[in-house]
Amino acid sequence: ESVALIESSVTDPMMRKQELEGEIMETTVENCILADVTMSAVCQGTDSNYVMGIDMARYGNDSTVIIVRDSYRIVEKIPLFHADTYTISSEIEKLIAKYKKIRIFIDGTGGFSSGVEDYIKLNHEITSVNFGSKAKDEYNLNARADMYTNLVKAIDGGFFIDDNAIKDELFATSYVITNNGKKAIKPKEQIKEILGHSPDATDALALTFYSTDTGISREREQQLIGLLFR
């Protein structure tokens, strides 16, 4: 049933091969997504530009992970194991109450999030993201590649990662250029083979960068411009 849900929701044939069969079409050599990226050693600030990402559990030992970040760092990471719709929705509601004005993005791939989405939509705006949907960037294969590209740019710009588990997931994540010239992120199942667990936290973090409008605050943007031209 779970496989059928993904098959029906992922329309891109290449993405379907990646998600269901762990296969990437003819490609060049793999590259770590953090290659040539310098990770910041310290957090450079804080603000109230809060964004939430929710990666939904799909199979077996996968967990639902909720990440909240501001423009500078991760402020919450909540893993939920074998959690039902009510439990997940309740955690989201608590975070909304805590952080007030917050933008929310949820993994809608395969329809696993439908119950949570319906509950949260009663009182709050929530954006469902199908990882296999069309990319906004013409050089990326799909929305998942868009999100990770934006995440890497943020890290290179000083976004602080102080969670070792997320660092491990990031370093285990690579990309390739497909035979049609698109950037594709390695499928979760292949990353899971390296780590021994699914990179759910990193996918939740990447979701917070789905929209470039939620990347950094205006204050942080001005700081980065100052660094570039000093």
Language model: regions and residue ranges:
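Acidic two-metal-ion nuclease catalytic site recognized across multiple nuclease folds
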Residues: 33, 78-79, 174-183, 193-230
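Short, flexible loop/turn motifs enriched in small residues
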Residues: 58-65
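Helicase P-loop NTPase motor core of nucleic-acid translocases
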Residues: 94-97, 103, 118, 189-200, ...
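Mg2+-dependent endonuclease catalytic cores in nucleic-acid-processing enzymes, primarily RNase H-like
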Residues: 72-183, 226-230
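Conserved hydrophobic/aromatic positions in well-ordered beta-strands
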Residues: 67-69, 205
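Anionic group-transfer/hydrolysis microenvironments
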Residues: 55-57, 109
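ATPase catalytic-site recognition across NTP-hydrolyzing enzymes
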Residues: 1-54, 68, 180
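A residue-level signal for conserved active-site and pocket-lining positions in enzyme catalytic cores
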Residues: 20, 151, 204
